[in-house]
A protein has these predicted regions:
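Glycine- and hydrophobic-rich flexible loops that cap the catalytic core of alpha/beta enzyme folds
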Residues: 1-215
Length: 215
């Protein structure tokens, strides 16, 4: 029987409202400032250029549908770091931008960790507040209920990096608001990922090992 794997481009809106499962063989979120800033700068350069109708393509996200506790989830075989960064970016950006462009107040998807279930709701705690002495916009670290967990430190640090990047040059908020949530067929600039959904009858961990051996 033929294996009907799916490979296509998906824009950011097509990633939303899905449930992503991060299995035990994946390491935690570990993007440093440099990696987060590289993504932000690359997107802003694309948004600023004369590229109407073109798209910025992120690296692949590889998933496989699995059943967990009688629910359908998408097990993330490759692309966890990108998927997590996009979610953190949306949590920060939507608080800065949504009222200005008539977009829904929040864009989101669910990420569940096999080995760290207690921090599943951490992304919903990312909140912008004002520093009393300077009135500067900052990430409210008092909302972090998991300060001793290494994953939470990286997630909150990424949120702070993203917020500071937007506040350093606020026109970036406008540019992201114009293009970040565009669909594939919008006719304007959009952000897309290479989406690969495998239906192979194999352990996803084996697929993960095979893919990483080729990198």
């Amino acid at each position: 029987m033929a294996i009907n794997n799916i490979m296509q481009r998906k824009a950011i809106p097509e990633l939303l409202n899905k449930k992503y499962y991060i299995p035990e063989y994946q390491r935690g979120y570990r993007w440093e400032d440099k990696q987060v800033l590289n993504l932000l700068d690359d997107l802003d350069t694309f948004f600023s250029g004369d590229t109407k109708g073109q798209f910025y393509c992120l690296q692949p996200i590889v998933v496989k549908e699995v059943t967990i506790d009688n629910e359908k989830w998408l097990e993330v075989i490759d692309g966890q770091q990108r998927l997590t960064t996009i979610l953190i970016l949306m949590k920060v950006f939507d608080q800065l931008n949504a009222p200005k462009f008539g977009l829904p107040k929040t864009h989101s998807y669910t990420i569940r960790y096999a080995t760290r279930p207690s921090i599943q709701n951490i992304f919903d705690t990312i909140s912008i507040t004002s520093e009393p002495s300077t009135n500067k916009a900052v990430i409210d670290e008092s909302k972090n209920q998991w300060p001793g967990m290494i994953d939470s430190l990286y997630i909150y640090n990424a949120a702070k990096t993203i917020l500071n990047w937007f506040m350093d040059e606020q026109p970036r908020i406008f540019r992201y608001g114009q293009y970040f949530y565009n669909t594939v067929n919008s006719g304007d600039k959009s952000v897309q990922v290479v989406w690969y959904e495998t239906n192979e009858d194999k352990d996803p961990h084996d697929i993960f090992n095979r893919m990483n051996s080729l990198k």
